[in-house]
């Protein structure tokens, strides 16, 4: 089995709720980190097999596949796919694990892993109530298998 290595790590500054970073788009924050990573390592963006990002509550500016949105916001090749993981507080850590598994399985060689989240714009657990206007009070109501 192939081994997986972390070749570098970059992060944004730690923000505060309603602080200096509160108006930054989560994709722009992720793009900033990805660009910094590629500049520091000299890795050719075309050599990247996948972008795996964690993000809690994929709604608003964080909706869709924010991993790919970050990549594209960085001005990088459209040929590189992305996937976003929501494992609550462990989302970015899970992204790193999935990236390592892709390399260890031999299906990928280079994967960018990380995460982005804008809690000043999207309050924690907002995704749980985001569909109220559609008549969906929470993700559980109406499920025959959900036990209260």
Residue ranges and their predicted role:
Residues 9-14:
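Short polar catalytic/cofactor-binding loops
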Residues 1-2, 16-47, 60-66, 71-148:
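Acyl-thioester C-C bond-transforming condensing/cleaving domain
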Residues 51-55:
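Short glycine-rich or small-residue beta-strand-to-loop segments that form or flank ligand, phosphate
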Residues 3-8:
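Conserved PLP-binding active-site segment in aminotransferase class I/II-type PLP enzymes
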